[in-house]
């Protein structure tokens, strides 16, 4: 179980606990449950890398305590 911190740069930080074999799509659903926005409207990225929904957190080497950027489409 890892904890990922997502910052939307509008003053909101979301902390989500998930497994490292979860996909980015699963992470979006967990974030959507906490923020109240739809999962389809969420984009997760780090610098200029936009993460795709079907790839796991382990494949992207996302580890415990890592900070990601949260954008709303």
From Swiss-Prot:
<keyword id="KW-0833">Ubl conjugation pathway</keyword>
<feature type="domain" description="Ubiquitin-like">
    <location>
        <begin position="1"/>
        <end position="73"/>
    </location>
</feature>
<dbReference type="InterPro" id="IPR039732">
    <property type="entry name" value="Hub1/Ubl5"/>
</dbReference>
<dbReference type="GO" id="GO:0005634">
    <property type="term" value="C:nucleus"/>
</dbReference>
<dbReference type="GO" id="GO:0005829">
    <property type="term" value="C:cytosol"/>
</dbReference>
<protein>
    <recommendedName>
        <fullName>Ubiquitin-like protein 5</fullName>
    </recommendedName>
</protein>
<dbReference type="GO" id="GO:0036211">
    <property type="term" value="P:protein modification process"/>
</dbReference>
<keyword id="KW-0963">Cytoplasm</keyword>
<dbReference type="InterPro" id="IPR029071">
    <property type="entry name" value="Ubiquitin-like_domsf"/>
</dbReference>
<dbReference type="Pfam" id="PF00240">
    <property type="entry name" value="ubiquitin"/>
</dbReference>
<dbReference type="InterPro" id="IPR000626">
    <property type="entry name" value="Ubiquitin-like_dom"/>
</dbReference>
<dbReference type="GO" id="GO:0008380">
    <property type="term" value="P:RNA splicing"/>
</dbReference>
């Amino acid at each position: 179980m890892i904890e990922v911190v997502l910052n939307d740069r509008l003053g909101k930080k979301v902390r989500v606990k998930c497994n490292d074999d979860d996909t980015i799509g699963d992470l979006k659903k967990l974030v959507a449950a906490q923020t109240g926005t739809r999962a389809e409207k969420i984009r997760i990225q780090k610098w200029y890398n936009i993460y795709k929904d079907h790839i796991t957190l382990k494949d992207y080497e996302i580890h415990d305590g890592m900070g990601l950027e949260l954008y709303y489409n």
